[in-house]
């Protein structure tokens, strides 16, 4: 073999090795039965690293092997809000800031949660904010304005969602139209519970857990382990469906810490959110049929880290704004189909990747 031929063989070998996708493990299913989608509202790379530093150098999010980035802009603004970004991720379409589950022309969009229901899967939502707030609402409601909380609450009765846990009780009970949606939910077979200890004891059936009149308190003000406990409860209930489930879990208040330019608030909420991520990963590792995806709807605060100590768990942060920013945010994926979540892509692509993972052809 002459040198020219030898180099050609080496080149082609390298192309074949690096140009092909790695084969799936024999034990890994082609499609996951379950998808757990966790959203750290306002959580950019700096927020994650601040939480990691405050947690003495480690987070469960480090265990993900497939990582990408999404572009977050909305249809009418370089800087998205949670309504537009939540809608983009849940339905695969960019929309205007403030719109929930609708395109810019106010046409309702089917969400991945609704499509999962149509295929016979169980579905659930968990949030540390009101369950009617922009991010969870974008998976289940269709309203032209994110502030139409009572209308968003009423949209819950138009679906077959199995579990939802979060604040916002007043939007179901103390309504201008006089309706008591908790009674209507009871008639549809839901357990209606307001106490997290009682909520955590439910293992089957339909559950509406309304844990606060409005939003749940911040972690340091008494919320405790509500997020991870609610995540575990939702997974237990939804896993009773043999066809699988879709669950969205939101750590809402990372965003609020960013709006306040409060680094301590941010890191306590990131660490709390990471505890829920750890529970989802534990479930997925034991189950082997579950895809776990973690991302943010946007970054908040323009956080920069000016100093810190892993040993002491201290972080020094500086901010460029009290609002959202336009930077890309990371995506972490684990489980069957996780390799499809690497790279840089639009936030709308998450919807397509979820349907592809399930093996659903409808869009």
Where are these regions (language model features)?
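Bacterial N-terminal signal peptides that target proteins for export
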Residues: 1-8
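C-terminal motif of bacterial Sec signal peptides marking the signal peptidase cleavage site
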Residues: 17-19
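N-terminal catalytic scaffold of extracellular/periplasmic and nuclease hydrolases
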Residues: 21-167, 172-175, 181-199, 205, ...
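Metal-dependent active-site segment of extracytoplasmic phospho-/sulfohydrolases and closely related
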Residues: 45, 271-310
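Gly-rich Lys/Arg/Thr-decorated short loops/hinges at beta-loop-alpha junctions or inter-strand turns
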Residues: 92-97, 208-219, 255-261, 332-336
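Short amphipathic alpha-helices and their capping/turn segments at secondary-structure boundaries
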Residues: 113-117, 198-200, 231-241
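Active-site His/acidic residue clusters
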Residues: 134-139, 213-218, 222, 231-235, ...
